[in-house]
Amino acid sequence: MSGVWVFKNGVVRLVEKQQATAGTAVAGGRRKALVHTPSGQVVSSYAALEARLTALGWERYYEDPSLFQFHKRGSLDLISLPADFSAFSSVHMYDIVVKNRDSFRVVDA
């Protein structure tokens, strides 16, 4: 049983955790999507994300098969993502946005 306990009008109830579709994350009951700002396109796969990050100077690490990792040469930044794109959450999206402020943003899907 997973979800969030909600207290409203003196009543406590459990709201079941929603299943997110691939490439979206549920935060506060709203789905999130990662958008490549220059093109306005939603990132819908790791292949699309890898192409965008590579163009920005990020290099892919292949050491750990359970993670999808990128490093930017000349910096200490590392982006670590779950190997399964369906587990890609808003936390991962915001990590990408913070490290690439002008290139990505997170929006309500």
Swiss-Prot record:
Record has Ubl conjugation as a keyword: yes
Effect caused by changing residue 73 to G: Abolishes its proteasome-dependent degradation
MF terms in GO: GTP binding
Signal peptide from the UniProt entry: none
Subcellular location, record wording: Cytoplasm; Nucleus
Subunit comment: Interacts with RPT4.
PANTHER family, A to Z: FLOWERING-PROMOTING FACTOR 1-LIKE PROTEIN 1 (PTHR33433)
Misc. comment: Overexpression results in reduced growth of the primary root, an increased number of adventitious roots, a helix primary root and a delayed gravitropic response of roots in seedlings.
Protein name in UniProt: Flowering-promoting factor 1-like protein 1
Organism: Oryza sativa subsp. japonica
